Amino acid sequence: MKRMITVLGPTASGKTMIATHLAARIDGEIISADSRQVYRRMDIGTGKDLADYHVDGKDIPYHLIDIVEPGTKYNLFQYQEDFHKAYDDIQRRGKQPILCGGTGLYIEAVLKGYQLSPVPQNPALREALKDKSLGELTAMLTELKRQTGSTMHNKTDVDSVQRAIRAIEIEQHNIDHPTPLRGAKPIDSLIIGVSIDRELRREKISRRLRARLDEGMADEIRGLLGEGIPPENLTYYGLEYKYVTQYVTGILTYDEMVRQLEIAIHQFAKRQMTWFRGMERRGFHINWIRNEDDLYNLLP
């Protein structure tokens, strides 16, 4: 069995390209750790950059991208199950598993072996919370996490009212229905963190946002709405899907959308780094690199 390699980093750090070039070199396959790239036809807004999976004339196999329909709400429990199916398959075929992404909760869940069980919806709780603001819900969630000592659901993944309500629902369920530890074992992994200078990251985020808008991100969202997906379901996915949906539906002007979305992505990248630093405090050893050459110096 091969020791997994994990490549993590904030948005616009270049982690996917580093991971795919590594995969081409060591006969690896990528398991995505991105909470939004699981959705089909949500390509531009999630930054799938599938061209990065073609290296030196070779297609790099990838997993957990384009696996569910847009409009659904994929969750951590499903991700953990899908990850282990992909991981076991890659190991069985003697290939090198490479976990790559920026969703810290997903990465930590599979590395640490979070003990998870499916949590049903709580209609009464949802009704009681539906009129509360995101700030109020965040405060409630913080208090629940204080009670349980939970490390799940930080601000990186709870950036809308719907997401916050679901997080509260899960934390409250775990208080009301404690379950014995069971499930996945922790996975030993060499963890590579792709570091990028803050100002360069901001520059790349701004440049990439404008490129994606030019590529037709608004048309992508119009197409999803045209399929009958309600605007609130797209807003649930946050960032590009939240703000561009508000533009397409007339809530924001184009300039307002660009300005607010750009700020939100910068804040998101900062929260991603906060999560990764938190992982280090929780005992994960992350080897930070700036480029591909640094990576190969770490490999046996």
Write out the residue ranges for each language-model feature.
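Phosphate/pyrophosphate-binding catalytic cores of soluble transferases and nucleic-acid-acting enzymes
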Residues: M1-P300
